[in-house]
Amino acid sequence: MTDFHNKPNIQIMFDSLAPTYDKINGILSLGLHIAWNNALVSLLGETNHLLDLCAGTGRVALSYVQNYPRASATLVDFSTKMLENVQKRHPSAPFSYITSDVTHLPLPDNTFRLASMAYGLRNLSYPLEALREVYRVLQPGGHLGILELTRPATYNPVYLLHKLYLNLVVPSVGRFYSGNSYAYSYLKESIRDLPRDAALEAIFHAAHLRPIRKRKLLFGTATIWILEK
């Protein structure tokens, strides 16, 4: 398997969510997304410039430059509204911005030592194509850190609780705060439909990105992979 299921027009959807995105994510994750972002930053380690893919409102890039004050970052997202949100809230941040799909990065080969992709993998219609593009722009020996919302294993004691949370709480909170119940129903479905670890890691290998570290967070409700070119 190299492609995920067909996606709706999520570019328009994420543009519409930009004003309330951080607030809703904070509520839905009980604030844990901050710790998860920091865990990704810690596992990536320090470099002078980070390529942050599917950057959204820039929370990972902000965490990165706060942890490594000498660093800067290039933020890539296909949602103009998301990137405008970062620029308005953090005008002095050491960021440059590119509005682009990850499958067609307007960047030269072998440029970046570190790249990140948080909560973006499950939104890709063509993950193998996107990961091959990331491989192209990474330096030899460079690393990509992926943080994604995942499902606990079926034998995990929290599996049923997590399923109920996705089915009942996530769409309700999203509808209440954003007025967009469809978007948060999509969030539920994108987590449910994300392939399990073995299938994902087969895609990583097909893109010539070798998993060198994996960390499960909160009983497997989120997962970090560090991949090496």
UniProtKB/Swiss-Prot annotation:
Enzyme Commission code: 2.1.1.163
Catalytic activity line of the entry: a 2-demethylmenaquinol + S-adenosyl-L-methionine = a menaquinol + S-adenosyl-L-homocysteine + H(+)
EC class name: transferase
Pfam family of the protein (one): Ubie_methyltran
One GO term (biological process): methylation
SUPFAM superfamilies linked: S-adenosyl-L-methionine-dependent methyltransferases
Disulfide linkage: none
GO function term, MF aspect, one: methyltransferase activity
InterPro entries reported for this sequence: SAM-dependent_MTases_sf (IPR029063), UbiE/COQ5_MeTrFase (IPR004033), UbiE/COQ5_MeTrFase_CS (IPR023576)
Pathway(s) of this molecule: Quinol/quinone metabolism; menaquinone biosynthesis; menaquinol from 1,4-dihydroxy-2-naphthoate: step 2/2
Keywords per UniProt: Menaquinone biosynthesis, Methyltransferase, S-adenosyl-L-methionine, Transferase
Binding residue positions for S-adenosyl-L-methionine: T57, D77, D101, V102
NCBIfam families named among the record's database cross-references: MenG_MenH_UbiE, PRK00216.1-5
Function, as annotated: Methyltransferase required for the conversion of demethylmenaquinol (DMKH2) to menaquinol (MKH2).
Similarity field: Belongs to the class I-like SAM-binding methyltransferase superfamily. MenG/UbiE family.
HAMAP family, per the entry: MenG_UbiE_methyltr
Protein name, entry field: Demethylmenaquinone methyltransferase
Organism: Chlamydia trachomatis serovar D (strain ATCC VR-885 / DSM 19411 / UW-3/Cx)
Name of encoding gene: menG
